[in-house]
Curated annotation (Swiss-Prot):
The keyword Transport does not apply. Pfam families: Response_reg (PF00072), Spo0A_C (PF08769). Phosphorylated by KinA and KinB. GO terms for biological process: detection of stimulus; phosphorelay signal transduction system; regulation of sporulation resulting in formation of a cellular spore; sporulation resulting in formation of a cellular spore. PROSITE patterns: RESPONSE_REGULATORY (PS50110). Residues 1-59 form the Response regulatory domain. This is Stage 0 sporulation protein A. The gene is spo0A. The keyword Repressor applies.
Length: 150
């Protein structure tokens, strides 16, 4: 937070995009970081494989690994029918329904949506499987996950 405060006072034409990675999931800390200019907030532990897509999302740049543009007749899905940028779609939907990114349940909700997208059967066992799986990933309890999402 101290770095964000100092960056805020540096006179530049444009403030850089900041991705904040932290183990602290307290709502007040997250809100302060967002207020100070953090563009994206990642709570530890997180999936390292998703970091490049988060960076591209924050920077507003497309995937540089794609060498040629996709033809316009192709849809935005892969061969197995899943969106190419699931995380961006989830973020967009969550923002559309008005869930602020600084609340603790935001990361749990993102994870839950992603897990259900990959395995629709989880909808039949939300409290028995989904919440405990999310709790394991974030090193917390299923009841805390449920409370934060609600």
């Amino acid at each position: 937070l101290a770095v964000l405060e100092k960056m805020r006072h540096i006179e530049r034409l444009k403030q850089p995009s900041v991705i904040m990675l932290t183990a602290f999931g307290q709502e007040d800390v997250t809100k302060k970081a967002v207020d100070l200019g953090a563009s994206y907030f990642i709570l530890k532990p997180f999936d390292m494989e998703n970091l490049p897509s988060h960076i591209r999302q924050v920077s507003g740049k497309a995937n540089t690994m794609i060498k040629r543009p996709l033809p316009s007749f192709r849809s935005a899905t892969t061969v197995d029918g899943k969106p190419k940028n699931l995380d961006a779609s989830i973020t967009s939907i969550i923002h559309e329904i008005g869930v602020p990114a600084h609340i603790k349940g935001y990361m749990y909700l993102r994870e839950a949506i992603s897990m259900v997208y990959n395995d629709i059967e989880l909808l039949g066992s939300i409290t028995k499987v989904l919440y405990p799986d999310i709790a394991k990933k974030y090193n917390t309890t299923a009841s805390r996950v449920e409370r934060a999402i609600r």
